[in-house]
């Protein structure tokens, strides 16, 4: 379980679209999105309070979320100092990038030294069985599309919100990185 509340790391995102992970979390879970941290040159802004890492720690933030989806899904060299500083301040870090936090030697060592968690949401520790086609109880609404960034998750979260407002039992089941971070 990813510890809450979150500080959304936007790094040096070149535009608002690059911060789509952070934007999704802020839009759908504003209660756990305490603030944002941006590096010089960042062109994205979620409209949240800008924090330093120290301010965020004092405000009770538990996890720094990499809120950027960049080309190639890599950790920019300009981000590493901030991410290492976060680990030294005992923040957990969560990321949905293709490059894994746990594959970065420096992050892994600092997390171990400071007893922090690294959450690579692209990797699961759960072994999911292959579907068998047998009828199951309950009802499901599958949201599918032909491309990314077309609104599948936002639509599904809006359906969940409306059903819950009508006191209909509903749970959002994430399949992508942003959805997993929204779900926690």
Task: Give, region by region, the residue ranges found by the protein language model.
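Short internal beta-strands
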Residues: 34-39, 94-97
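ATP-dependent carboxylate-amine ligase catalytic core
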Residues: 2-7, 13-15, 19-36, 49-61, ...
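Extreme N-terminal, non-catalytic leader segments
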Residues: 82-140
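Glycine-rich, highly charged phosphate/nucleotide-binding loops
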Residues: 43-57, 70-80
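Short, small-residue-enriched loops and turns at beta-alpha junctions
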Residues: 70-75, 100-102, 127, 148-150, ...
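Walker A (P-loop) phosphate-binding motif
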Residues: 128-172
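Redox-cofactor binding/interface segments in oxidoreductases and associated redox assembly factors
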Residues: 65-69, 95
